[in-house]
Regions:
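Interdomain hinge/lid region at the active-site interface
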Residues: 208-281, 298-300
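NAD(P)+-binding Rossmann beta1-loop-alpha1 motif at the extreme N-terminus of oxidoreductases
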Residues: 1-58, 65
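Internal alpha-helical scaffold of NAD(P)-dependent oxidoreductase catalytic cores
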Residues: 39, 140-226
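Short beta->alpha hinge that forms the Motif I/post-I loop of the SAM-binding pocket
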Residues: 38, 70, 94-96
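A conserved regulatory-domain signal marking ACT and ACT-like small-molecule sensing domains
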Residues: 283-367
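N-terminal Rossmann-like NAD(P) cofactor-binding module of classical short-chain dehydrogenase/reductase
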Residues: 66-67, 92
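Rossmann-like NAD(P)(H) cofactor-binding subdomain of soluble oxidoreductases
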Residues: 78-134
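Residues at the starts of beta-strands that form the adenosine-phosphate
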Residues: 9, 32-34, 118, 145, ...
């Protein structure tokens, strides 16, 4: 089997956001997909969306690949069942933790070593704050990392199949062992979720008048706090050992910050605050840029637009006709006014040109 060309049929067990998105993407690639979920409602929604057909237990269906897209608590058991039910199929899972799953499978006396060889863990680094099949998108994984996590007994055929799924879904393939993967996602995914949730929880008793002043800074840092608590309880529990040292490091920094703020004008306090902020600057600068490229600084052009249909589309059309590429875009609505502020990021060398073009077209550019 060539990499990037998956042979069906495929069975997707778990028709939530990830499972249904994978099914939609594979169906778009012309692959036959069967669906199975403990929730009849979730199954029906996925079928109605065109993700595949129902493939309940006992049907005459022999998939070459089974994708397990279920919460971490039940994933090992469902993998074991799939390995037993489909003895010729490769089985992969999409859970965001890997070490606890492979450990549970190895400890399961009912899972033979030969069967376990057909299993490979996968973790698509894509998602949304919304959950469930109705939030699924066939292009969800496009250009996102697809982490393949084989264990020492995984066959080369199983690993190649796991890679092919990601490639057929438009993802970028990365291979890691379970420990490296779990440490990485603890830092870049699970810890940010905790930080966002803790920050958002501070807003529970905040006066409405204070929240009315909120801008994109607060919205950006609390966006993922809207994620499903039921799923995250499981994720955090399964990756607790990797999270503890990160949280202990944060605790140390918070203790240091509190000590400084208790006497902010003492000798050395300003330097300590500057060091904390600078460390944050340096860490943020290490985050890769677009398409995995090295970090790059962009210039920002701010434009006031009326809160009317088509305004942003017209703005971007004017940019395109001028031959200026937009690197990123943010929009902030003005409280109490029917206008918004669009912040467009462009290459620094194109900033003045863009300001001139937009001003000439009567856009309200904030200088």
């Amino acid at each position: 089997m060539a990499e990037g060309y998956l042979q069906g049929p495929v069975l997707v067990i778990g028709t939530g956001l990830l499972g249904t998105s994978a099914a939609l993407g594979l169906r778009a690639a012309g692959i036959e997909v069967g669906l199975r979920d403990a929730s009849p409602t979730a199954q029906r929604i996925a079928v109605d969306m065109g993700a595949g057909f129902l493939a309940p237990h006992g049907t005459d269906f022999a998939p070459s690949l089974v994708i397990v897209a279920t919460p971490p608590d039940v994933t090992p058991g469902i993998i074991a069942q799939a390995l037993a039910e489909f003895p010729d199929a490769v089985v992969i899972d999409l859970a965001s933790v890997k070490g606890s799953i492979i450990d549970a499978l190895k400890a399961d006396d009912d899972v033979a070593e030969a069967d376990l060889a057909r299993y490979v863990g996968c973790h698509p680094m894509a998602g949304r704050e919304k959950s469930g099949p109705a939030a699924a998108r066939g292009a969800l994984f496009t250009a996102s990392p697809w982490v393949v996590v084989p264990h020492e007994g995984s066959t080369s055929h199983a690993v190649k199949t796991a890679k092919s799924v990601g490639l057929d879904l438009g993802a970028s393939i990365t291979v890691m062992d379970a420990e490296t993967h779990d440490a990485a996602v603890a830092l870049i995914s699970h810890f940010p979720q905790i930080a966002s949730s803790l920050l958002a929880s501070r807003l529970l008793n905040a006066p409405a008048s204070s929240l009315a002043l909120a801008g994109n800074g607060l919205r950006d840092t609390t966006r993922i706090a809207a994620s499903d608590p039921r799923l995250w309880i499981q994720i955090l529990a399964h990756n607790a050992q990797q999270l503890i040292p990160i949280l202990e490091g944060l605790q140390s920094d918070l203790d240091r910050l509190l000590a400084t703020l208790r006497d902010p004008f003492a000798s050395g306090a300003a330097l300590d605050l500057a060091e904390l902020m600078t460390e944050g600057n340096q860490g943020q600068a290490r985050i890769p840029g677009k398409h995995g490229a090295p970090p790059q600084s962009f210039a920002t052009v701010s434009v006031i637009v009326n809160d009317e249909p088509g305004q942003v589309a017209r703005l971007l059309t004017d940019m395109g006709e001028a031959g200026i590429n937009m690197e990123d875009l943010r929009m902030e609505h003005s409280s109490g006014y029917e206008v918004g502020l669009v912040e467009i990021q462009v290459l620094p060398g194109r900033r003045d040109e863009l300001v001139s073009v937009l001003t000439g077209l009567d856009w309200k550019v904030v200088q």
